[in-house]
Regions:
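A short Gly-Trp-Pro
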Residues: 1-122
């Protein structure tokens, strides 16, 4: 499933390939307010824009909509139902989707920073 294992360090492999989660408030982009685009760390496709990013108070980067194609799959780990989100291009794990986001979508894409790279908009 994980097509980019060779390019990743051990922690990136854990999150992206093994569907792990990084720590809240201890990740690169949770508080990033710089305008720009977030790309898939594995394959480089654009996934999210800072225009759709908001502070959800969770300690992870949160977006109310993607700009790229995202796959969704049920996630029943830990005895609870969640919706996993993955890059549609490479199938790398990004995070989870929740229904408690702001207007206009009511969605919260809760994303691991380690699954992304960021390019500022100048």
């Amino acid at each position: 499933m994980c097509n980019c294992k060779n390019k990743l360090n051990d922690f990136e492999k854990y999150v992206i390939c093994e569907k792990g989660t990084e720590r809240a408030f201890d990740n690169e982009y949770w508080n990033n307010k710089t305008p720009g685009i977030y790309f898939c760390k594995c394959c480089g496709v654009p996934l999210f824009s800072s225009e759709h990013k908001y502070d959800s108070g969770t300690g992870w980067p949160s977006f109310y909509m993607p700009v790229g194609e995202i796959l969704e799959a049920p996630d029943l780990k830990g005895g609870m139902f969640r919706v996993e989100v993955m890059c549609a291009n490479c199938k790398g794990h990004l995070g989870h989707l929740f229904g408690d986001g702001p207007a206009p979508t009511g969605l919260r894409y809760c994303i691991n920073s380690v699954s992304l790279t960021f390019e500022p908009k100048y």
